[in-house]
Amino acid sequence: MAQFVFESDLHSLLQLDAPIPNAPVARWQRKAKEATGPAPSPMRAANRSHSAGRTPGRTPGKSSSKVQTTPSKPGGDRFIPQRSASQMEVASFLLSKENQPEDRGTPTKKEHQKAWSLNLNGFDVEEAKILRLSGKPQNAPEGYQNRLKVLYSQKATPGSSRKTCRYIPSLPDRILDAPEIRNDYYLNLVDWSSGNVLAVALDNSVYLWNAGSGDILQLLQMEQPGDYISSVAWIKEGNYLAVGTSNAEVQLWDVQQQKRLRNMTSHSARVSSLSWNSYILSSGSRSGHIHHHDVRVAEHHVATLSGHSQEVCGLRWAPDGRHLASGGNDNIVNVWPSGPGESGWAPLQTFTQHQGAVKAVAWCPWQSNILATGGGTSDRHIRIWNVCSGACLSAVDVHSQVCSILWSPHYKELISGHGFAQNQLVIWKYPTMAKVAELKGHTARVLGLTMSPDGATVASAAADETLRLWRCFEMDPALRREREKASVAKSSLIHQGIR
């Protein structure tokens, strides 16, 4: 019996087509097990180490193609982007919108939409920049390099490109004497009429200078010694001049007839600021009150605004007549409505960011909800406000007292008059508030600014008893001709409508 077992074992050992027991696993079998099965055990690794010096080259009958296995994680096709980051709905809407007819709309509808956009957003959406200035960005991490840096050109602007800057004379066009002008920051002593007549208050007198003919006329002189003129303001269209005095009076003069029409008394202290809104004359007093006067009726005092605790030194109606801005010695700026609300006369907005007296207040002529204000020596800032939202759009430290601010109707710029130490006028670009030019010449602080009716010349009155005329907003001749043609066409349409 043992003989048969021995023969069977011998036969199995000599048989070549049977698997060899305890032999190393073939390479193709080991690769297949590693791809589909668990990691090999230490025992199998030890068994393979005996035959590490000899590797079979090719297994008979086995194809050379590698066995394809299913990956454990889906890798994704690199030529197909992930749609989770794509705005497919927006793209579909834009593609479908291109096939629809364009909605041109009526001019009236477009004007209403633009007005709503200006009041709600503070800017026109159609003309706005995609990226708007919102503050200083955070610094990048140390060692960070922007991979998009190669997309931006480092070359200088070609010399053939058109220059965007214009020539601004650094010297005044004319210098007039202003003897005995009161060196008082809180007074408003100069104003330029639509008829091209400049009114200047010199102590107790008011003088008129006709810019066209050069004639000078003394309109009035205070009767009582010690009294003086504290403010002057022309009506928007006409020959009527309002005069505020130190004895709390508001006088109304017909300049053409050189006659005082009426004397309005309602204040208890000097009237340091005046502003017109059609037939309503608003006056600000040292008592902190603002009075509305209806110059058509005998009972002229129609309203009292109480929003300041000290002197109202800045007062200005908006060009559209919807808002009144007031600045006071209490460092407060109030924005008032044109009419009383449900709770009476209350300010729509109150700004308290200034740290000094606010005399300089000016409304943007092309954007009725934008207001510029300037603070005194303790503040030295110019701030731009959106009176609808109450937001401060920008604040610029000018390093000196701000006495007055004017907007240019021809350029998107504004000019400010300053005090110590340089007593200069500065032109700023809006809305970036970049400095365009500085006009120097006064030897004492600027007391007030006013602009000619054509918007080209600015008159500055200073404590050095001079009145300087600066032609800093001269309009381009081609642009002037275009505007003249547009005004003529508009007037002809009005006449046709009247007929």
Swiss-Prot record:
GO molecular function: anaphase-promoting complex binding; histone deacetylase binding; ubiquitin-like ligase-substrate adaptor activity; ubiquitin-protein transferase activator activity
PANTHER family tied to this protein: CELL DIVISION CYCLE 20 CDC20 FIZZY -RELATED, CELL DIVISION CYCLE PROTEIN 20 HOMOLOG
Keyword Protease: no
Metabolic or biological pathway: Protein modification; protein ubiquitination
Subunit structure: Component of a complex with CDC20, CDC27, SPATC1 and TUBG1. Interacts with NEUROD2. Interacts with dimeric MAD2L1 in its closed conformation form. Interacts with BUB1B. The phosphorylated form interacts with APC/C. Interacts with NINL. May interact with MAD2L2. Interacts with CDK5RAP2. Interacts with SIRT2. Interacts with isoform 1 of NEK2. Interacts with HSF1 (via phosphorylated form); this interaction occurs in mitosis in a MAD2L1-dependent manner and prevents PLK1-stimulated degradation of HSF1 by blocking the recruitment of the SCF(BTRC) ubiquitin ligase complex.
Subcellular location: Cytoplasm, Cytoskeleton, Microtubule organizing center, Centrosome; Chromosome, Centromere, Kinetochore; Cytoplasm, Cytoskeleton, Spindle pole
GO terms under cellular component: anaphase-promoting complex; centrosome; cytosol; kinetochore; mitotic checkpoint complex; nucleoplasm; perinuclear region of cytoplasm; spindle pole
WD repeat coordinates: 182-221, 224-263, 266-303, 307-346, 353-395, 397-438, 441-480
InterPro entries: Cdc20/Fizzy (IPR033010), WD40/YVTN_repeat-like_dom_sf (IPR015943), WD40_CDC20-Fz (IPR056150), WD40_repeat_dom_sf (IPR036322), WD40_rpt (IPR001680)
Free-text description of this protein's post-translational modifications in UniProt: Acetylated. Deacetylated at Lys-66 by SIRT2; deacetylation enhances the interaction of CDC20 with CDC27, leading to activation of anaphase promoting complex/cyclosome (APC/C). Phosphorylated during mitosis. Phosphorylated by BUB1 at Ser-41; Ser-72; Ser-92; Ser-153; Thr-157 and Ser-161. Phosphorylated by NEK2.
CDD domains for the chain: WD40
Protein's UniProt name: Cell division cycle protein 20 homolog
BP terms from Gene Ontology: anaphase-promoting complex-dependent catabolic process; cell differentiation; cell division; metaphase/anaphase transition of cell cycle; metaphase/anaphase transition of meiosis I; mitotic sister chromatid cohesion; mitotic spindle assembly; mitotic spindle assembly checkpoint signaling
Covalent crosslink: Glycyl lysine isopeptide (Lys-Gly) (interchain with G-Cter in ubiquitin): K485, K490
Ranges for region Disordered: 27-82
Alphabetic keyword roster: Acetylation, Cell cycle, Cell division, Centromere, Chromosome, Cytoplasm, Cytoskeleton, Differentiation, Isopeptide bond, Kinetochore, Mitosis, Neurogenesis, Phosphoprotein, Repeat, Ubl conjugation, Ubl conjugation pathway, WD repeat
